[in-house]
C-alpha cells in the first residue's frame, strides 16, 4: 500500500487521505474535480500532510493548500502559502497570457448560488484543466510556470 501523503477536502467539511487504490493519483484528482456540480459538490482542496502524520488516525489541517470552487465546467483555483517571513498569502491562479482588467467580470458561483466570486477570464478553469494544476501541486507543493498568481486581499 502506498503511504498516504496528502489530504483532500470536499465542500470545506469532509476530509480524508488522497488514495490511489482505485485510480492513480492524477486520475483520482481529475475524477473528483469532474464530479463538481456547483450544488451538492462545489469545493475541493488538497494539501500535504505533515511528514509524521498517520492519516488513519488523524486528518490534520494545513496553512498551505490548493483549492477550487464552482463546477466541473467553470471553477476558480486558489493557492494559499506561507511566505518566507511566515505570513500567509492567498492567490487566484490564472492561465498564462490573460489580461488583468481593472475589475474581474467572470462570475463563479457555488453552493447552489449562495456564494460567488469574480475572476478574470483566464482565471476560469474546467475540471480537466484544474486537474493538471492540482497534480503539479501534489508533486511539488507549488503552482508551476507558466500559471500566474494574483494575490487576494483577505483583510
For every predicted segment, state its role.
Residues 51-88:
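The feature represents the first ordered module of a protein
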Residues 1-46, 69, 80-155:
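Acidic, proline/glycine-rich low-complexity IDRs
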Amino acid at each position: 500500500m502506498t503511504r498516504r501523503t496528502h489530504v483532500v477536502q470536499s465542500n470545506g467539511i469532509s476530509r480524508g487521505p488522497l488514495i490511489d487504490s482505485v485510480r492513480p493519483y492524477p486520475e483520482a484528482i481529475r475524477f473528483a474535480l469532474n464530479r463538481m456540480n456547483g450544488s451538492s459538490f462545489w469545493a475541493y482542496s488538497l494539501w500535504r500532510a505533515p511528514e509524521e502524520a498517520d492519516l488513519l488516525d488523524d486528518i490534520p489541517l494545513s496553512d498551505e493548500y490548493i483549492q477550487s470552487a464552482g463546477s466541473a465546467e467553470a471553477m476558480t483555483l486558489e493557492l494559499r502559502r506561507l511566505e518566507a517571513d511566515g505570513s500567509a498569502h492567498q492567490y487566484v491562479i490564472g492561465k498564462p497570457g490573460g489580461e488583468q482588467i481593472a475589475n474581474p467580470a467572470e462570475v463563479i458561483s457555488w453552493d447552489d448560488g449562495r456564494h460567488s466570486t469574480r475572476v478574470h477570464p483566464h482565471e476560469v478553469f474546467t475540471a480537466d484543466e484544474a486537474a493538471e494544476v492540482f497534480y503539479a501541486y501534489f508533486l511539488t507543493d507549488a503552482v508551476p510556470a507558466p500559471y500566474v498568481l494574483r494575490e487576494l486581499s483577505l483583510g
